[in-house]
Amino acid sequence: MYQDLIRSELKEAAETLNNFLSDDANIQSIQNAAVLLANAFKAGGKVISCGNGGSHCDAMHFAEELTGRYRENRPGYPAIAISDPSHLSCVSNDFGYDFVFSRYVESLGREGDVLLGISTSGNSGNIIKAIAAAKAKGMKVITLTGKDGGKMAGSADVEIRVPHFGYADRIQEIHIKAIHILIQLIEKEMADQ
């Protein structure tokens, strides 16, 4: 009944992954991001992650697997996803939704920390403001974007961009794969210290 649709969806997902994989710059960006994060942890820094909608879920997923565990038992790493409902509703109400992430970064970010901003379009105003706040604090910035990178293109120390121009779910599928690889590489870097 739906087998052709299922095959088509899985085929498109595989093609998106293969296109991403075929560009060595994408592989290098993931490696650079992992090393940047591990070096921040080694120096006593933390990562603050943020995103909207499904990307918000990815930001939380990233943080929980760093503070909790991924595949192996090991010490937790300092990671915070900006997801506190009281913070989000307060700042949205009092300042506007564009400031929900930047206010948090202004409050808790410091030099030596890393911001991970996730936006499939690269055009999320609140992530753009968070990037500016992070830079003002002397933080490093990693972005996970899609399409042409949008307004966030070129704004990060490391950008992992999925150059897919279709629906956002394909971009999100690569983002979560990149997140899992980042954690795997961070664990390796931290174990090798």
UniProtKB/Swiss-Prot annotation:
Pathway: Carbohydrate biosynthesis; D-glycero-D-manno-heptose 7-phosphate biosynthesis; D-glycero-alpha-D-manno-heptose 7-phosphate and D-glycero-beta-D-manno-heptose 7-phosphate from sedoheptulose 7-phosphate: step 1/1
Cofactors demanded by this protein: Zn(2+)
Highest taxon, organism lineage: Bacteria
GO molecular function: carbohydrate derivative binding; D-sedoheptulose 7-phosphate isomerase activity; zinc ion binding
Residues that coordinate or bind Zn(2+): 61, 65, 172, 180
NCBIfam families recorded: gmhA (TIGR00441), PRK00414.1 (NF001628)
Miscellaneous notes: The reaction produces a racemic mixture of D-glycero-alpha-D-manno-heptose 7-phosphate and D-glycero-beta-D-manno-heptose 7-phosphate.
Complex formation: Homotetramer.
Protein name in UniProt: Phosphoheptose isomerase
